[in-house]
Swiss-Prot record:
GO molecular function, a single term: actin binding
Classification lineage: Eukaryota, Metazoa, Chordata, Craniata, Vertebrata
Residue numbers spanned by region Extracellular and involved in cell to cell contact: 1-124
Post-translational modification: Autoubiquitinated as component of the CTLH E3 ubiquitin-protein ligase complex (in vitro).
Entry protein name: E3 ubiquitin-protein transferase MAEA
Gene from which the chain derives: MAEA
InterPro entries in alphabetical order: CRA_dom, CTLH/CRA, CTLH_C, Fyv10_fam, LisH, ZF_RING_GID
Organism annotation: Bos taurus
Residues found modified as Phosphothreonine: T28
Zinc finger (RING-Gid-type): 352-419
Length: 434
């Protein structure tokens, strides 16, 4: 029974930590399936149209040349349909094989062979490190590690490299690449926006006018006009930034045209923000009047990068922290005790990761370990003190395990490792824990 419970806990832990491993390729497969369906439907409608035109022509007394021309058109449309279908099916097949490969990899964790389980754990650690490096921006290092470990098809490198291109374009103060990304994912971005709107409605939270920060950007309005969806939050922020850049370049007429094209259907909090930025038309680019000075701050580009990163993670249902970070924090919290943070440092153990200098600061904001039953650990040996190794207290008040005192006894005397005081072994008294 205990073995079954342990296996169930391991399986649940695996599902929680490995959710992104399967979710990202599944979303890619879903996206390619929908794109293939649209492409095939569109090309099929084109074929249907030319066939209908051919049938209409044949119902009369057409000339041979016109029939040949129409037949050539039918052949051309059929060729395009075949090519699009083959390309779409190949793309779907690649995504399906990737999902299957990752499922097979995750199944390997339950192997009965210790060597196979050890290899799987090593690969899992490498996958966590690759994802963490990608999130931190160390793309070359991450790619090299994935290639060296043979896990290129087990990590989401392609997704992060696409995000890298978008972020680099925003750093160059260009919006075209990010807008193209928004267009490729417009349906899912609008669904995200709709879910956020429903959540705000249920919680009674009112959307605030975005001032440029990623947190505020996610609170933009979610209304629709006459059944037509608004721009996604990120796309709207990009259009606002384009307007601001036109004002910065003193191209006010172009800014007005831009506003008419992209902001004419704004409503809700988006309309409030449009009204705010339209006020920039009355001020010079070097104005010191708030809030226009803040809108002209180049730091808004960094905020756009953060907003894109946030939306990209939500789009693929990824957390804001890497699995490596979460796993490390969970492990540190599980072994963190008040002894790790004694000011004098006397109670720190050299074998405790939390007591080490590199991880002590990282674990500081984490909660302490939950321990229903206390355990006494000998300072000398690190062994648990129990009925087989009873705790013994020296006259100076320090407690050590009986076996440890035996190991350091010389001429029936023991030296306290902490105070260097010398006592007779018979002076050590047994401690009883109630």
């Amino acid at each position: 029974m205990a073995v079954q419970e342990s296996a169930a806990q391991l399986s649940m832990t695996l599902k929680v930590q490995e959710y992104p491993t399967l979710k990202v390729p599944y979303e890619t497969l879903n996206k390619r399936f929908r794109a293939a369906q649209k492409n095939i439907d569109r090309e099929t409608s084109h074929v249907t149209m030319v066939v209908a035109e051919l049938e209409k022509t044949l119902s009369g007394c057409p000339a041979v040349d016109s029939v040949v021309s129409l037949l050539d058109g039918v052949v051309e449309k059929l060729s395009v349909l075949k090519r699009k279908a083959v390309e779409s099916i190949q793309a779907e097949d690649e995504s399906a094989k990737l999902c299957k490969r990752r499922i097979e990899h995750l199944k390997e964790h339950s192997s009965d062979q210790p060597a196979a389980a050890s290899v799987w754990k090593r690969k899992r650690m490498d996958r966590m490190m690759v994802e963490h490096l990608l999130r931190c921006g160390y793309y070359n290092t991450a790619v090299k590690l994935a290639r060296q470990s043979g896990i290129e098809d087990l990590v989401n490198i392609e997704m992060f490299l696409t995000a890298k291109e978008v972020e680099e374009s925003l750093e160059r103060r260009e919006t075209a690449t990010c807008l193209a990304w928004c267009h490729d994912n417009k349906s899912r971005l609008r669904k995200m926006k709709g879910r956020q709107s429903e959540h705000d409605a249920k919680t009674g939270r009112k959307s605030r006018v975005a001032s440029g920060s990623p947190k505020e950007s996610e609170d933009l309005g979610m209304e629709t006009i006459k059944g037509k969806p608004e721009l996604s939050c990120l796309e709207f922020s990009l259009r606002i930034q384009e307007f601001i850049e036109l004002i910065r370049q003193n191209k006010r007429l172009d800014a007005v045209r831009h506003a008419r094209k992209h902001f004419s259907q704004a409503e809700g909090s988006q309309l409030d923000e449009v009204r705010q930025v339209m006020g920039m038309l009355a001020f010079p680019p070097d104005t010191h009047i708030s809030p226009y000075k803040d809108l002209l701050d180049p730091a808004r580009w960094r905020m756009l990068i953060q907003q894109f990163r946030y939306d990209n993670y939500r789009l693929h249902q990824l957390g804001n922290s890497s699995v490596f970070t979460l796993t490390l924090q969970a492990g540190l919290s599980a072994i963190k005790t008040p002894q790790c943070y004694k000011e004098d440092g006397s109670s720190r153990s050299p074998d405790c990761p939390v007591c080490s200098r590199s991880l002590n600061k990282l674990a500081q904001p984490l909660p302490m370990a939950h321990c229903a039953n206390s355990r006494l650990v000998c300072k000398i040996s690190g062994d648990v003190m129990n009925e087989n190794n009873p705790p013994m207290m020296l006259p100076n008040g320090y407690v050590y395990g009986y076996n440890s005192l035996l190991s350091i006894r010389q001429d029936d005397k023991v030296v306290c490792p902490r105070t260097k005081e010398v006592f007779h072994f018979s002076q050590a008294e047994k401690v009883y824990i109630m």
